[in-house]
Amino acid sequence: MSKCRFDEVSLFPEAFNNFFNHGLIKKSFEERIASIHIHNPRDHAIDNYRKVDDEPYGGGAGMVLKPEPYFSVFDQIPKLNKKRILLMTPQGRKISQSDFCRWSTQDQLILICGSYEGFDERIRSFADEEISIGDFVLTGGEIPAITVINGVVRLLPGTLGSAESLEEESHNEFLLEHPQYTRPSEFKGMKAVSYTHLTLPTILRV
């Protein structure tokens, strides 16, 4: 059994294909560090046209995602005890590295991707958290969901080659890293600078 199960609820499952086929993310799924299960609400539509959206009550621009297909998907997803259900929405709370750390301790993350004008409000009822990756609007929740998977998977034990990579990385202490260099020590007149021993001003010394 994998260390973390991801369940993606998305109208566009093909958006995730290339993401899982390279780098550390591919390695984590191949080695069963994590597993991914994608669910398309269109497969749960209740009419012959596989319709998943409708006009908003009261009028207005755009189409609203219908509750029936999403509730049907949600009911059929196996639920683990230690889980979080995340709704991708522009109105959600902006996430940070601390959220990835918190979610990496879960056995299951269910990520619900929106599209069109948004969700029927009743779909929000089964979400533990409504989240956003920034103060902007995208065409759907797939990119935020991919961001969450990427941020969480790399924190799972066995994904990165060295534990030090996690301990020393940029945002663990919410500080930016110093500039990084590698060989050659000089390139086109530009020299690499060693930050192994930094001299701090007296006021910053502990």
At which residue positions do the language-model features occur?
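N-terminal nucleotide/polyanion-binding subdomain common to many enzyme families
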Residues: 1-77
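Hydrophobic/aromatic beta-strand patches that form the interior of the parallel beta-sheet core
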Residues: 7-9, 37-39, 86, 109-110, ...
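Short, solvent-exposed amphipathic alpha-helical segments in soluble enzyme
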Residues: 23-27, 101-105, 128
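Short glycine-enriched loops at secondary-structure junctions
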Residues: 41-44, 115-119
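S-adenosyl-L-methionine/SAH cofactor-binding core of RNA-modifying enzymes
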Residues: 64-113, 120
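Structured adenosyl-cofactor binding patch, chiefly the S-adenosyl-L-methionine
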Residues: 119, 123-164, 169
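Internal, active-site/partner-interface "lid" segment
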Residues: 155-191
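Conserved small/polar residues in nucleotide/adenosyl-binding loops
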Residues: 196-199, 204
